[in-house]
Amino acid sequence: MAATILIVEDSALVTDAFALLFIEAGYAVHSARTVADATRIGKEKAVDLMLLDLTLPDGSGLDVLGALREAGRAPRATLAMTGHTEPELRQKCFDAGCADVMVKPVPIRDLLRQIERLLG
């Protein structure tokens, strides 16, 4: 069975591009554009990896991870994406349980390599 990725990203363009890329790479994909939707999907579906934008319209992507961890539904791995490079933010992501933090724009080849590493 294919690993499942939950894309949590408020940009429809980015979400659609990632979804197409991941489906072509053989992954099952779910997507959400808000904290509320991502939390609901994460609680309802088995997710292996969450690709998590930190800035969402209704809060922080880290809120999603916290809610899923609290519900016992955290994915095997969470990969945070952000346009910010502050060391404090990176540490906050790691403290919340993220496996890694990638700075946007994320090179596709690097993203796929990191996903394969985290799911391997």
Positions of the model-derived regions?
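Active-site residues of response regulator receiver
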Residues: 53, 82
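Two-component/phosphorelay signaling modules centered on CheY-like receiver
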Residues: 12-30
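Acidic, metal-coordinating helix/loop segments flanking the phosphotransfer/catalytic sites
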Residues: 31-49
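Acidic catalytic/metal-coordinating carboxylates
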Residues: 34, 60-63
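C-terminal output helix
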Residues: 106-115
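Conserved acidic carboxylate
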Residues: 9, 56
